[in-house]
Amino acid sequence: MDTKADRYEGIDGLKAYAIIGIALMHVLANGEYGIGGFVFERLIPSFTNLVFLFMMVSGFGMCCGYYQKIVNQKISVEDFYKKRYIKIWPYFALLCALDFVISPSKESLFEVFANLTLCQGLLPNAKISVIGVSWTLAVIFVFYMLFPFFCFLIGNKKRAWGVAVAALVFNWLCSNYFNDGRTNIVYDAVYFIAGGLIFLYRKELAEFVSKYKVIAGVILLVVSVTYFAAGSSTFTMLSFCVAALIYTLGCRTGGGVLVNPVAKFLGGISFEIYLCHMVIYRVLEKLHLVHLFGNGLLAYIFTAVAVICGSVVFSVCAKWFLNKIETFLKEKVNNRRVNHV
């Protein structure tokens, strides 16, 4: 993994704000609240595209942790994929089981099986409803499968730029010819490649942002405004994600909006929150709490806060529970080995 000196603390804050935005968007979209204005008609709905930011951060983060190990053959194929499954599968399996209990059906059982393999991202147009937001996980796991090939693609800067251009063209073809959207790894590849490119230039970019943080902030503001002025497109979203990730590289000192204990905590469990927040929403829905205060702003705020807080509590408790089980199983295996010696 990257060393302490190479750790980019601001990324946790970036992930924290991204997951809050996505949760706000899903609550608004599913609750069908009768509220209007720019914030509720354009700003919050646009947060759906923050999933692409997660993909870019995944590309960058995986490179920080494993690029040199893969290139220098310091990690075996078995160890690499084992770590991916061990990190994701237990928590995701628990969520799938809960989702099935909440809404049991034959179709859900089929989808749970697909989810538990973590290979659902290989299915064409799967449209899985069990943990529906996990399509992002499905795409990211396909990226994990292809990561050794990805390391080859960004093996040098010249090749990486060529691959980035090809990925951008492929993204356009997916939209305009092949009719494949964001649930397809080929469509999303440009975001992972962009994360890899930023990794290749990470030292220069971090130094630039540290020296000229105001300029980097202005660039981020400009691309954010452009996103709304020019409309949502791969180019505008890609520009925003790149500017946001680059800006965070220079945020290493505490006290800011990106580097603080709360942001670090939420960023550390951001993907767990992402996967569970709609399960929490469905529970609130079944308890008839989504419209407890009517259909207006107060009801939306209450539901959004309840979903976010509930997701945080669930994520922390679930991780604690799964860690206890893991520790118990390891101790049991170790005791058996001792007894056999």
Language-model features, listed with the residues they occupy:
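Specific aromatic-rich, kink-prone transmembrane helix
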Residues: 58-61, 145, 193-200, 244-249
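Short, aromatic-rich membrane-interface segments at the entry and exit
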Residues: 110-111, 158-163, 181-188, 231-240
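Alpha-helical transmembrane segments of multi-pass integral membrane proteins
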Residues: 101, 192, 221-324
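Membrane-cytosol interface segments of multi-pass membrane proteins
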Residues: 1-173, 269, 291-341
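A cytosolic-side transmembrane-helix exit/cap motif
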Residues: 129-136, 184, 207-209, 255-265
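Juxtamembrane membrane-interface segments at transmembrane alpha-helix termini
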Residues: 54, 71-72, 124-125, 173-180, ...
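Signature aromatic-anchored transmembrane alpha helix within multi-pass, membrane-resident enzymes
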Residues: 165, 211-224
